[in-house]
Amino acid sequence: MLLLELKKTNQTLETIHFIGIGGVGMSGIAEILYNLGYKVQGSDLVENYNTKRLESYGIKIFLGHAEQNITNVSYVVISSAINPKNPEIKEALERKIPIIRRADMLAELMRLKCSVAVSGSHGKTTTTSLVACLFEAAGLCPTVINGGIINNKSTNAYLGSSNYLIAEADESDATFIHIPSTIAIITNIDPEHLDYYRDFETLIGAFRSFITNLPFYGFAVCCIDHKIVRKLVDEITERKIVTYGIDSEDAHIIAFNINTDIASSTFDVKISLPNVLGTTIIEKITIPTPGRHNILNSLAAIAVGIELDFGIKAIKNGFNNFKGVKRRFTKVAEYNNASIIDDYAHHPEEIKATLATAKNIANKQNGKVIAIFQPHRYSRMQYLFDDFMLCFADADILYITDIYAAGENPIEGITGRSLVDKITKRKHHDKANFLAELDDAVGVIIDNAASGDMIIMMGAGNISSFANELDGRLSSRGFSCHTVV
């Protein structure tokens, strides 16, 4: 009960220090605490968008981790990504400064509000943003803590005036099951974070607890187009669950009459809620982002809006006001009339969804899909190697770089080159190529881009920075590139 105790004793001047404050999850919580009146500071190894944003508010940021950074702090917040040998952790333990996990701090914030927790292997960040837009359109100004930058706000977290809090619930280390939410959303469940869970069944069990831990008056929202989620929903009888999908005719909320282009998706929705007679049709809902997966994300938000009686007008207005999320199919530049897209996809299922969207758009433009993928983490590649071999079918031309380690040690035989070799050997793709250096992607674009093409730069590593610097890199070689964002 940290936050409640601080409030009761008026100890808001005590300093809360975040180790790894530049991380998207940590920076969001730090920003909310700062806006609530707490004294916040933090450290990180490098400067980034998040640290610069926090510094602009007056939050002190230390570059690098050192014992002296926590000289005058009362609490230390860490995430699961922080090495236990970190000098600031060692100093906090030595001085008996309370160390709080990021998920526990998030739980404290959520305990004070009526909370919506959004989880799932993919789509959490976009879904969280969409839900927030509907709340605002309904006249409820929520507090939001997201896993990505919401373009409407240019931040991943902001303090609202209502009693609602909407948060992305990270499932990577099972701490999300302890988050005190009233409404829980599950977008999908795929084999991910198996370095922590060890097996898929344990991961599924965590999602089961995520739902069953809801209070009796709460409800879950689940996508039953996903077979694992459907099975889970069928097994749970003690909590109210609202289902959604595109292919599932028995879902409570279904999208149909779907049309999508490079900038948006339009669809109709059929609503048949449990214990409610009759069916409601909402026609011509438009979301300003393409892709079937984003339509599913919007259905989750619609389910929450319908259950909370937001009304059809608020739902449509909320989506009209949505401006997307940074690094989710973000068009960053144009070269030779080809679109260059920056996307966070780093799991095989995310890659398939992103490339399917790109393929649909490219076909309408008589173009091709050029995929440049930077794998993220050796452990993920090892666990999902076979899935990675099969997820690039919608790319007409494929380039794979070496693996972005994200702090992990190399694993023998697990490299970007070995993935390309296996894809080629097993004939899963006839135009798969290895990029020895990310900078070689500039030449790939110069040599291959043509009018109507979709150039998709994917990964959770530094490929995003590269994509956003393409105008300068192309200009330095004498080629003109139009920057979009």
UniProtKB/Swiss-Prot annotation:
InterPro entries: Mur-like_cat_sf (IPR036565), Mur_ligase_C (IPR004101), Mur_ligase_C_dom_sf (IPR036615), Mur_ligase_cen (IPR013221), Mur_ligase_N (IPR000713), MurCDEF_pg_biosynth (IPR050061), UDP-N-AcMur_Ala_ligase_MurC (IPR005758). This is UDP-N-acetylmuramate--L-alanine ligase. SUPFAM superfamilies: MurCD N-terminal domain, MurD-like peptide ligases, catalytic domain, MurD-like peptide ligases, peptide-binding domain. One of its GO terms (cellular component) is cytoplasm. The gene is murC. The keyword RNA-binding does not apply. It catalyses: UDP-N-acetyl-alpha-D-muramate + L-alanine + ATP = UDP-N-acetyl-alpha-D-muramoyl-L-alanine + ADP + phosphate + H(+). HAMAP family: MurC (MF_00046).
